[in-house]
Amino acid sequence: MSDQDARWKPDAESWSILEVINHLADEEEADFIVRLDYTLNRRTDPWPPIDPQGWVTERRYNERSLGESLQRFLSSRQQSWRWLRGLENPDWDIVYEAPWGPIRAGDVFAAWVAHDLLHMRQIIEVHWAFLNQNVTPYSTRYAGEW
């Protein structure tokens, strides 16, 4: 997929594939791993603030390179895996008192995985819309129901 294609959006309210990938990279570095670390190791410290929605425009995700963005995400994910593998008998039931209420370390970890899956679905949906817009005069019907 070219950078230009990765910038395509089905509508003004949707994110492009490039925006989703950069969001995942920022979340990998500033959200889940940080908040899981705080929950496991620094429960009395407040979680650092994040602004995932604002970062999309503030950090100009859609102006970035797809290749560099993917590499950044993959590199951050590798660091996260190394950190996770280094945990010794984490207590997944430890509770952090978030502003909205208690959350366990296991909840943060489960949400991290779920967040990935939600955005994988989002990328697939955007790619599907892009394909269907760009195959005209042909059709994807033969592939099956969406």
Question: Which residues does each predicted region cover?
Answer:
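Acidic/histidine-rich alpha-helical segments that form the ligand environment
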Residues: 53-93, 107-112
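Short helix-to-loop capping/linker segments positioned immediately adjacent to catalytic or ligand/cofactor-binding
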Residues: 4-9, 66-70
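Short, contiguous alpha-helical
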Residues: 7-52, 95-146
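A generic short-segment signal for beta-strand/edge and adjacent turn/coil regions
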Residues: 4-7, 38-41, 76-79, 87-88
